[in-house]
Amino acid sequence: MRLPPLSRRHVPAAAALASLAFILAGCGGDDVTATPPSQPEAQAPVGTTATLALLETTDLHTNVLSYDYFKLAADNSLGFERVSTLIAQARKQYPNTLLLDNGDTIQGTALSDYQALVKPVGCDQTLAIYKVMNAAKFDGGGIGNHEFNYGLPYLSQVTGNTFEVDGLPAPAQQKKCAGPNFPQVLANVISAKTNAPLFTPYTILTRTVTATTPDGKTVSAPVKIGIIGFTPPAIMNWDKRWLDGKVYTTGLKEAAEKYIPEMRAKGADLVVAISHGGLDNSAYSPTMENGSWWLSKVSGIDAMLIGHSHQVFPDANSTVAQFNLPGVDKVKGTVNGVPTVMANYWGKHLGVIKLGLKFDGKTWTVDKSQTTVEARPIQNADKSYVAADPSVSAAIAAEHQATIDYVKTPIGSTDYRMNSYFADVGDPGAIQIVNEAQADYVKTYVQANLPQYASLPVLSVSAPFKSGFGGGTDYTDVAPGALAINNAADLYLYPNTVYAVKVSGADVKNWLETAAKRFNTIDPTKATVQPLVSTFPGYNFDMFTSADLAYEIDVTQPVGSRIRNLTYKGAPIDPNAQFIVATNNYRASGGGNFPGLDGSKTIFASPDANRDVLIAFIKKRGAITRAADGAQRSWRFTKLASSVAHVQFASAPNRLGDAAAAGLTGITQVAADDGSGKNLSTYEIDLTQ
């Protein structure tokens, strides 16, 4: 059931979610022009000042509750239900607020997959995440790359739009469905059919703020705030199967330079860019993934809300490369002088930009001397967490329970613990079963439908999607015993579909060289602590687990020259030999920028999700064993003749037993706390063993 919009005059209409509907003193959440104040703007004295707090959520990924559907357990370190408490606190602190979401909102948990794929929401139903956001009275939002993961028809429906794109009926023939009660803006994704933006590129919100005149009087005055949204142009690769031929993207700078002058001409006092991307100051490209550094240089932007990178900004102690670029002030929270915030991910932080405003007689401008930026965590200084807003869980109780019931569906059993705690150093325990399922599926299809490729060997590749980025609980961990759908979702995190590509032996080598970017270059002659794992994402650390394929990774060599002794069936791999590799749509279409993988090598684009293929494979096999499904190591680190280096990496605390069970040697835990504040320990690996 769709919740009615909350208003300042009709609070009882949403009594069930009353504690989410915090009253704004001056700034409402409705997508309407606020009631004109008693004193019109033109009469506000020159020098009148005000404070407007921009509140940001980003990369919520449908973590509505503090709950892990993979482990079927509470996880107090995340969840919108706790951010909702921070929102309430900020609204009490500041008389004027604007609550905005940065995107990557509708995908990311078993709840989102249940509502999109298992029991799709009806046209008259509002997604669980949008239901609670409506109740929280968001003022606006952007669109992230993951919004496109389920396809354009679904996105059109759940956002309450009627996209005019190929594959959908004409807008007049589409039914406008339930969606968010706040405007969503996106300026750089264009319909190929109409050459018009897929979403509204920007909107201008008129809000009444409480202000102070130069003589100290309190007055009400309208402020016009323009919001404009951007998403990574790389969606055209990542979700090519849904988007190719239907939409295209423009660069962030180009879109901003087109629309911001329009926004100003239409009376926007302020312009807030909602950019779902991080910071990258390399040579500008209209297709660059993280273009927010360049966006900040476009004239006319007063503040930026950024995301996508799953990081915290500002953070004075951050060692993250993008926050230590020229022009980036990680203490004050500015990018090339523009106040900027990134509020982490999964509901771990609330971004707050407190804008100091000054009225010059015609318009409101930002007083940077009165502007501050912070990302407020849901974790308190004493390591406890802020209380959850109970109305959030009450609002989606039915959806939550239905998801739990679904993921408890039994599918098989395992005799070993399938985890990714030591995937970075060679444990295939949570990878091999995925590779087996993909290979079995592709082999069957090729034999039945692609006789021209039937003689080619089929390999399979996947990555440890959960490799500790989010801390000690961010690992795949499936206990021995009965297997259910939630375990399969833990093994395969994303709603990808199976793709098969035809590649050469040389392509396989290049594929592995790219995956080996996961590691830093180690100098074995230096008796210093040297971090093994780089910032290269774990979800791009592709691994083969075939008895026919073997290779070594030499981390003493530079990127691009690390793969040694690459063999197929015991002989050096032939660069010209042809192989079929089972993978996913993201990788086959260019995700991760692997050489040669740009969509052109795809021979089979399956409609079936990798996770569903995995579930079917486990059901067919019934009993999964370490000997058959979790012990095939295709790769090892090159053994060093000697080394005095202290090569270290992070993983969850007290997991050495898992390393031993996987047959890994030379690993010790050297510190119970790695100092990151993410519940990780420091381990050391001896590369001479």
Model-flagged regions — what are they?
Residues A16-A18:
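Gram-negative bacterial Sec-dependent N-terminal signal peptides
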Residues I23-G26:
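C-terminal motif of bacterial Sec signal peptides marking the signal peptidase cleavage site
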Residues D31-V32, P36-E374, I433-D440, P451, ...:
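Acidic, metal/ion-coordinating pockets
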Residues T231, K368-S384, T567-G570:
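Short, solvent-exposed aromatic-acidic interface loops
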Residues L350, K368-S369, V373, V386-A395, ...:
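Active-site or pore-adjacent capping/gating segments
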